[in-house]
């Protein structure tokens, strides 16, 4: 279910502080975060945010189409290697 409009978007305070500092200094350095639950705000557009996927940090370049989504949606946590091959059908 979506979050209530009355509550507004959720962004971790430490992440928002890093984003504000990066925007103020016009920094191109990626922002490293573990906060997959934070929502992408219009202030994040154009920044590179490294989102942790459980093993390493995945760089995410934020575009206008990502606003309103969560950071974790763009850093997949599972790798799909395909289903097992049927050996009978090869004959």
Swiss-Prot record:
Keywords of this entry: Ribonucleoprotein, Ribosomal protein, RNA-binding, rRNA-binding
Gene3D superfamilies to which the protein is assigned, alphabetical: 30s Ribosomal Protein S19, Chain A (3.30.860.10)
Record GO cellular component, one term: small ribosomal subunit
InterPro entries in alphabetical order: Ribosomal_uS19, Ribosomal_uS19_bac-type, Ribosomal_uS19_CS, Ribosomal_uS19_SF
GO biological process, one term: translation
Keyword Ribonucleoprotein: yes
Any Pfam family the entry gives: Ribosomal_S19
Keyword Nucleotide-binding: no
One Gene Ontology term of the molecular function aspect: structural constituent of ribosome
Main function: Protein S19 forms a complex with S13 that binds strongly to the 16S ribosomal RNA.
Family: Belongs to the universal ribosomal protein uS19 family.
UniProt protein name: Small ribosomal subunit protein uS19
């Amino acid at each position: 279910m979506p979050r209530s409009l009355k509550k507004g978007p959720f962004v971790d305070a430490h992440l928002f502080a890093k984003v504000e500092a990066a925007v103020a200094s016009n920094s191109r350095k990626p922002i490293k975060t573990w906060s997959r639950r934070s929502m992408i705000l219009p202030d994040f557009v154009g920044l590179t945010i490294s989102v942790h996927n459980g093993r390493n940090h995945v760089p995410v370049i934020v575009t206008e189409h990502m606003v309103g989504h969560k950071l974790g949606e763009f850093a997949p946590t599972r790798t799909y290697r395909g289903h097992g091959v049927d050996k009978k059908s090869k004959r």
